[in-house]
């Protein structure tokens, strides 16, 4: 097993972890309904890029 030779300081530990944070997923607004949804995903009403692609219960 690998064992560290010297203790890593809190500063170095933080620098090592600096890129591990989570980012907020980008949201898109559907132009026809005005609803927000994840990019490249169908909106809750079944619209994708201005077109109705899925029939929903309300249809």
UniProtKB/Swiss-Prot annotation:
A Pfam family annotated for this UniProt entry: Ribosomal_L32p
Residues in the signal sequence: none
Any GO BP annotation: translation
UniProt entry tagged with the keyword Cell cycle: no
Residue ranges of the TM segments: none
GO molecular function, one term: structural constituent of ribosome
Keyword Transmembrane helix: no
Record-level GO cellular component terms: large ribosomal subunit
InterPro entries to which the protein is assigned, alphabetical: Ribosomal_bL32, Ribosomal_bL32_bact, Ribosomal_zn-bd
Biased segments, Basic residues type: 9-19, 49-59
Keyword vocabulary terms for this entry: Ribonucleoprotein, Ribosomal protein
Positions of region (Disordered): 1-59
Protein family: Belongs to the bacterial ribosomal protein bL32 family.
Name of protein: Large ribosomal subunit protein bL32
């Amino acid at each position: 097993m690998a064992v560290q030779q010297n203790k890593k300081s809190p500063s170095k530990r933080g620098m090592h972890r600096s890129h591990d944070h989570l980012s907020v997923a980008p949201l898109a607004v559907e132009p026809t309904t005005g609803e927000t949804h994840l990019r490249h995903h169908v909106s809750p009403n079944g619209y994708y890029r201005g077109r109705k692609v899925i029939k929903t219960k309300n249809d």
